[in-house]
Structures are given as structure tokens and as C-alpha cells.
Amino acid sequence: MGDIYQLLKPKKGYAYTKEQIIDASLVNLPIPTGKKLKGNSRVIGDVDEETFKIIVDTIISLCSRFNLEYQEMAYTLLICLAESGFNPDAAAGTTSASGLAQYTRSTADAFKARSKSILGFEIDMSGTNVFDANIGCYGVLVAFLFNKNLALKWGFKPNDDKYWQLIYMLHHDGPGYYEDDRGKERALRFKWRKDAIDTYERVFKKNLLLLTALLKQKVETKLKLTDHEGKAIENKNYIIATVKSPDRKKPTHLSMNRNEKKEINVVFGKTNSNGESSPVHSRIGDEIITLLLP
């Protein structure tokens, strides 16, 4: 079936011409050279492989932490692919849309309240914070959760193809507008801009089920211990614990739902000469708890 990174690997888009760029656009802001996670330019998909993979991994981790199902996790990743091509410094020329989820200036300014409502804590996305990769990953997650909640509120169900299409349509056309009755009326009519429909067909409909299947695969994971100088720590005793029979619909967590009975795999060992543990096989996003012993 291939590889998650291979499926999500973005293609570099095209730069805006001078005539296309409006005053509200952030496309001409210089990218700080000292940023750890940054794009090569403001163009969609113009990001190096290391940054791309870190952003994919961060979004997966956040989706797991907030208990999303694998199909929802796949959808959240595809939002980032469609909007910015995983370039945290991407910016539109024809609007003020910027960052990983392409929030406009107004929706970025409103993000502090929205993150508090949905995630339980405030995140400031205003100004150039919209280009911060970690903040942007939260922005992608909230984009999915906010519009998912609207779709459910308006009577759409996950077993309906329109439910999945609606989530991206709402984000693409600006989620703030759709909280009122005008948005609900338009959602029920299900008439959207052609570019939004084309993107949904090309990115989401084509890849959602395949990416979901890839995320459900078991992968090999190793613990690697190093000191502050990056040197391997050998012969360190450890315990690694995972859930024995993970949920097939979503990542499994040992630290959540503690009243539920769970079978646990426990591995005892010592790190090898490379500072590595024995391999552990688990589904992507599953929680792995590690204890280091004297």
C-alpha cells in the first residue's frame, strides 16, 4: 500500500505574480532565517523533507491525544496537504490566508477563543504567529474539529459522503461565516465553489480511505536514548508498555479511560550499544509508555 509520507508528500505550487497580490496578503513578509521549522518560500508545498515529516508526525500526535478516529486523523492530515502542502510559511497572494491551515487574518485573530472552546486552552495565532509550525498544527486540528461539529449540529452523519465533503467546504470558504443560519442554509443546499469541489475530489476523495488504512498499520518503534551531547546511552534498563489488543478505529491510550480493562504488553530490557531498545510493534498513534530504571 505504500508509505504515509509518500502519499502525503506535497508538490510545490506556483508563486503569485505581482499583479495578483493584494495589500492584505502576507506573502511578501520575509521568513526569519532562525526558524527551526520553516518553509523555503511562501509557496504551497515548498518545504524540505525533514520539516514535512515533523509536521506530519506532530499532527498525528495531536489527533491521537485528542482521541480522533483514524479516518478523522487522515482527514486532518489531508486538510494540511490541501491548504499549505505542509509549508508552515505558506501564504496566499489573493487573500490574507496563511500558515498550515491557511487561516485568514480575521480567523487567526479569533483563534484564541476558538481553541479555548474546542481544546480547552488558549492559543494565540494572531500576527506572525500564524506561521509558527506548532501553532499551525493545532490550527489544522481545530479546523477539522470545528467544522466537524458544525456538520454534526446540522444533521449530517459520518456514514454520509456529504458529511465528509462538508467539513472541507466549510473550512475552505471560511468557517466563521457558517456559524449562523445563512451558513446552515447554504450547507443544506450543498452548493460550493468549483475550486473547493475540485480540491476535495483531488485530495480527499482520492486519498482518504487509503490514508486511513495506512494509519491503521502496525509499525516498528524503538526507544533511542542519548545524552545531552547526542551520544548513545548503553545498558540502560527500561520497561515499555503498550495495549495488547488496540482499537481498530482509533489509537489506544494506556493513560486514558483507566476504568476500562485492557490487556498490556510489557517489555523489559537494556539499551544496546546504539542506545536503542528492542523493537515494539504498535499502530500509528498508539500510546507507548516508557519507564527508565536505575
Language-model features, listed with the residues they occupy:
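Non-catalytic cell-wall polysaccharide-engagement segments
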Residues: 2-53, 58-62, 66, 106-219
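Conserved alpha-helical segments that form or flank metal/cofactor-binding pockets of metalloenzymes
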Residues: 83-98, 102, 106, 111-112
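Short Pro-Gly-centered beta-turn/loop motif in secreted/extracellular proteins
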Residues: 231, 278-289
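A short, amphipathic beta-strand motif
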Residues: 219-229
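Short, ordered, surface-exposed loop/turn motifs in non-cytosolic proteins
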Residues: 229-256
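Short, acidic Ser/Thr/Gly-rich low-complexity loop/linker segments typical of extracellular
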Residues: 247-276
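Short, functionally critical alpha-helical segments immediately adjacent to catalytic or ligand/cofactor-binding
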Residues: 69-87, 140, 167-173
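A short, solvent-exposed loop/turn motif at the edges and junctions
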Residues: 291-294
